[in-house]
Amino acid sequence: MKTLVLLSALVLLAFQVQADPIQNTDEETKTEEQPGEDDQAVSVSFGDPEGSSLQEESLRDLVCYCRKRGCKGRERMNGTCRKGHLLYTMCCR
């Protein structure tokens, strides 16, 4: 059940990322990495009003980042992110 909720949240997050307007500027089309460009934070929360087993600390404060070059430290790869025509790795901790 937890896996289903997590996957549903990730799918909704992917749709939200794709719904953002596409901005084609020279900065986005550069292949050079800019400082901080790969650290786009996304916060995902789980639970219902009455509380449930989904209120565990590990699922309540899931923080994800869209990174160019893979996950760092304690992060785990949880899919992909898209910004415009560029594809990033979604890393969550």
Curated annotation (Swiss-Prot):
Residues in the signal sequence: 1-19
Protein name: Alpha-defensin 10
Propeptide residue interval(s): 20-58
Localization per Swiss-Prot or TrEMBL: Secreted
Example GO biological process: defense response to bacterium
Similarity comment: Belongs to the alpha-defensin family.
GO cellular component, one term: extracellular space
Distribution of this protein across tissues and organs: Paneth cells of the small bowel.
InterPro entries: Alpha-defensin (IPR016327), Alpha-defensin_C (IPR006081), Alpha-defensin_N (IPR002366), Beta/alpha-defensin_C (IPR006080)
Disulphide connectivity of cysteines: 64-92, 66-81, 71-91
UniProtKB keywords: Antibiotic, Antimicrobial, Defensin, Disulfide bond, Secreted, Signal
Keyword Signal: yes
Function: Probably contributes to the antimicrobial barrier function of the small bowel mucosa.
Chain residue ranges for the region called Disordered: 22-56
Predominant location: secreted
Any one Pfam family match given in the protein's UniProt record, by short name: Defensin_1
